[in-house]
UniProtKB/Swiss-Prot annotation:
Function: Could be a mediator in iron transactions between iron acquisition and iron-requiring processes, such as synthesis and/or repair of Fe-S clusters in biosynthetic enzymes.
Entry coiled-coil feature ranges: none
PANTHER family: FE(2+)-TRAFFICKING PROTEIN-RELATED
Protein name per UniProt: Probable Fe(2+)-trafficking protein
SUPFAM superfamilies: YggX-like (SSF111148)
Domain of life: Bacteria
GO biological process terms, semicolon-separated: cellular response to oxidative stress
HAMAP family cross-referenced by the UniProt entry: Fe_traffic_YggX
Annotated keywords: Iron
Amino acid sequence: MSRKVHCVKLQQEADGLDRPPYPGELGQRIYDNVSKQAWSMWVQQQTMLINEYRLTPADPKARSFLEREMENFFFGQGSAPPPDFSPDHS
């Protein structure tokens, strides 16, 4: 049976993650309050941010930026795409 959480992103009960997806306090907070579906939404958002800003995840500044965006995505005002972002509809 799946673990259920009240997802802060979806504002509904949903299947929870199997384990904390990120180290430390933020990872535990996400594990306790974010659903699998919302985590999948974040992975798509993170991929877009990495591609649009040409980030290297191994770079400490990029990791710090992505961590702030992740916290905003789930617990703040959300994570906005870059100003000139236009999704490819092809």
